Every structure is written in C-alpha cells, then in structure tokens.
Amino acid sequence: MATYFSDNLTADQQNQVQQIIQQFQHPTLQKDLIVLNTLKKVEKGGDTLRIELQLPFAWNSGAEQLKQAVSDALLKATDCKLIKWAVAYQIATLKRANNQPAVKGVKNIIAVSSGKGGVGKSSVSVNLALALQAQGARVGILDADIYGPSIPHMLGAADQRPTSPDNQHITPIKAHGLSANSIGFLMNEDSATIWRGPMASSALSQLLNETLWDSLDYLVIDMPPGTGDIQLTLSQQIPVTGAVVVTTPQDIALLDAVKGISMFERVSVPVLGIVENMSMHICSECGHHEAIFGTGGAEKMAEKYNVKVLAQLPLHIRIREDLDAGNPTVVRVPENEISQAFLQLAEKVSTELYWQGSVIPSEILFKEVK
C-alpha cells in the first residue's frame, strides 16, 4: 500500500521524505524501511510534521535511532519545526516449523534451548521476554523446564496460582506485563516433579494448548536443558517459529550447544542464532571486564555451523540478585549496560525471526502501541 501524503506537501517534498527514510541504515535491517512498506502516512499541519510508521517486528530501539538520525533532514525538507512520530506494530505471523497448526492466541513461538544445564538459559529466557516487550511486542513466557521450573520465582510470582474460567482452560499469570505459565505455578515450590518422559511431554503440551494466551506476538518457551527424548519430542510437538541456543564460552558448553543446533535442524526448526551467556565477567566494584571462561568460542562455532551470534551477555551479580528478588534486570534498571544488551538481543531475535521466516498474511493483526 502506498504512503499517504497530505496535499500541502509538494511532490518534491514527498520524494525527499521517502529518500531520507530510505537511506537510513541499521544492522538489523536487510531491506530499507520504504521497501518494507513501513511508512504509512505523512501529514503537514502548520509547522508540524506527523509521520506514521507501521513495523512487522519489535523494534522500539531501532525506531528511536531512526528518529534521531533523520529528524533534522526531514524538518529541513518539509519546512517544519516539529515532528510527531506515531509508531505502530503489526507483528507478522510467520510460518511454523513443519507447517504445524498455531497455538490459539499466539502468533510466534521462540524456543530458548541449551545443550546442557547451568548456562543461564532461564535467566536469558526471562530477560529476553521482557526485552521483547520493551521493544513493543505483546509477549508471554512458558516454563517448559518441567523438572526445574524456575520462571515463577524469577518473575516474583511463585506464590500465585492460575485460575480456570471453565474448568478446562487456564488463565495465565500476569507478571511484569508478561503472560506466564509454568508447572511451578501448579505445585509447591519445594516439591519434586517425578515424571517419565512421555508424561512430562504430555503435561507440557496441555499447559501450552490449554492456557488462554492473550493475543501474543511472541511466546518465549524456556525449554528443558539437554537434547534427550523430552527435548526432541517437545521440538516436534510445539509449533515453533524459531529457536535460540544458549551457551557459555567454555568448550564443554559449546560442544553441547552444537548438539542443540543439530536437534533443531533434525526436526526442521530454524535456529535464529546462539547467545553466548557469561561471555564477560563485570566486576561489581570497579566495572572491570574479564573473560574468565575464555573468548572466541561462540564466533568459531557460529562460523563453522553457519549460525549467527545474537548476543554476548555478561556475567554480573546484579542479574542473579534481580532474578532472586523476582524483579529482573530489564525491568528493574532498563537503562543500564546489562539491560541494553538484552534489548539488543530482543531486537535481533525479532528481526532475525522475520527475515528467516515466511509471513502468513491471513494471521496478521494490527496493534497500536504508542
């Protein structure tokens, strides 16, 4: 659909506006914003220019960079003194692995996986979900780590219990704006889950499909660690749009991450990339950065297996303290270095999902966010 321009903008001014926005470059863009058809309306009223953008991925940070980069040129081109931006999101529904049917109320599912435990997969899942929300999307999180459900505690919601409006479906818990569900909400915090693989897989499938997800753009699933039968079964049963594999710089973790990539390839789930967690230790006293687990492993693995390094996240005591307190870093201190790293990760995950995927036009819904 062509961009609407108000009649008081000359043809030359209209062309200049499009050229200025078209020339904006960003690391997450594989096509320019005009080719993407994101510029919907440009209106001039007095000395004020109103610009409406509509984006198919969660991109608040990118939109802010766009505003800073092009505003002066746009004001000059249109003889205006003020720009009012309106950014809306029409998050694309993308093709699911193996053409599986959608989960009701969910556009896209992002599986966060690790080849082994202890690499910080759950902490990445929680902060990624919150960062996607901060980037403009409606987001939920499902704790599929059936034997060690930690998401309720990390979200500060361990004492909450879900309700059922009809004795058949579950209303998700709301925490920090996220819609969340976990087997941990249904049992005591100190109880052990002693289930065989098929029972665990069946329970998680129920949890996914019987939760009343509220028109989510993205559902982040915190997968169980490892690459065994449960993980393989879940990867086959869940209509995943794309997967993120979490690792650390240690050689043994990288070897297990390769197994995770291979597992998703085996079941035809696109791997968006790897997240190298604990990439750098940041001293809480002096801010010194030290690569205590080594360097370069993620880049070498990414090159060898043709995947992207989506982020290299720090090891910092604040991440652990904030999650223990149920107030994740991304919401507690959104402007600090750690939160910004997660926001960049969310931006890359959302855009990479879009570029790798195929849009399902009939399932796109419109949502005004600001």
Swiss-Prot record:
SUPFAM superfamilies the record matches: Fe-S cluster assembly (FSCA) domain-like, P-loop containing nucleoside triphosphate hydrolases
GO cellular component: cytosol
Keyword Metal-binding: yes
PROSITE patterns given in the database record: MRP
A GO BP annotation: iron-sulfur cluster assembly
Pfam families: ParA
GO MF, one example: ATP binding
Entry keywords, A to Z: ATP-binding, Hydrolase, Iron, Iron-sulfur, Metal-binding, Nucleotide-binding
SUBUNIT field: Homodimer.
Protein family: Belongs to the Mrp/NBP35 ATP-binding proteins family.
Name assigned to this protein: Iron-sulfur cluster carrier protein
